[in-house]
Amino acid sequence: MIQELFRKDIKDFRPYDAKGEKYKIKLDANESFIGLSKEIKNKIIRSLIELEFNNYPDPDATKLKKAYGDYIGIDEKNIMVGNGSDELIQILTNAFLDKNEKIVTLNPDFSMYEVYTKVRGGKVSVFDLDEDFKLNVNKIIEYINEEKPKMFIFSNPNNPTGGVIPKYDIIKIIENVNCIVVVDEAYMEFYGDSILDYIKKYDNLIVLRTASKAIGSAALRLGFLITNDTLLREIKKVKPPFNVNSVSQVIGEIILKDKDFIRESIDKVLYERNYLLKELKKIDGLKVYETKSNFVLIYNENANEINESLIKIGIKVRSFTDENLKNFIRITVGSREQNIEVINCIKGDNYDYKEM
């Protein structure tokens, strides 16, 4: 009886897999391996002592927006803060999609675009990247114009491949489609060629950012939506009033003001990324994809066995059940010690590697 009360369209729905098992080394969620500095931690402690826990948080996250605007060089009036990028994706589907209306996204890409669209009652049209995970810009423009979606959303750099769509190609898409274009730049600090400077030039452009990756603050659940005045005014109508808690606002502001710490953290990740890429490429039988993110995607026909061996020694990486990614593994860039453990396990004599 109770089961009949649930929506029929979510009966066979597959939720996002975010299990919380404990591992010695966790390299599956693209988190930063760098902890906060002692100086930042001391500032946080002093600020939390003064925090008024009896009051609701600032609904506009005013100070946090100002700090993030200073960090990215964008007017705070063009920024909205969310409880992680996930909430902002959900807000966008609520703002733009009526039931059965459509988005276009890429395959492969971040699965939450599809999840929130379906929860909203919308439909998803998927455009496949080519076998090397490259995007044919002319074909995606043609596809979008045929599908007539309300929104085209994609990650750049791409998750899970680490590949990028050049800025000039994104501009070409924006100028030649009749829908909202959402560029999820969760990993942009590891790449650098952002589309942010164009938010006021194009009336159909929205950019998403996060504090969970380069800024190293996944625990805070802070996401940022950046767009022009007109779009932001309408999107705010469906934003919950107290969606970002006071603790996250205070801590986020403190971290964002320490630009030297963030820059040094990014440099450390990039240094280790180069090391991980170099060492993985030395292993016969692995196809290693170039990346502009804080993770590396690898392919091998024995990927499942590699994954199981890593798990046995307490290392968690990201494997996939999707048919087009079943022999792939995504490895978050870790510390030098963590990267060495991963490399030593993968290049052990446990596998009969097959050349591709």
From Swiss-Prot:
Coiled-coil stretches, from where to where? none
Q: Which UniProt keywords apply?
A: Amino-acid biosynthesis, Aminotransferase, Histidine biosynthesis, Pyridoxal phosphate, Transferase
Which reactions fall under this protein's catalytic activity? Answer: L-histidinol phosphate + 2-oxoglutarate = 3-(imidazol-4-yl)-2-oxopropyl phosphate + L-glutamate
Q: What class of enzyme is it?
A: transferase
Cofactor(s) named in the record: pyridoxal 5'-phosphate
Family matches, as CDD domains: AAT_like (cd00609)
The UniProt entry, under InterPro entries, shows:
Aminotransferase_I/II_large, HisP_aminotrans, PyrdxlP-dep_Trfase, PyrdxlP-dep_Trfase_major, PyrdxlP-dep_Trfase_small
Q: Which family does it belong to?
A: Belongs to the class-II pyridoxal-phosphate-dependent aminotransferase family. Histidinol-phosphate aminotransferase subfamily.
Q: How does it assemble?
A: Homodimer.
The name this protein goes by in its record: Histidinol-phosphate aminotransferase
**Organism encoding this protein:** Clostridium novyi (strain NT)
Q: What is the lineage of its organism?
A: Bacteria, Bacillati, Bacillota, Clostridia, Eubacteriales
Q: What's the gene?
A: hisC
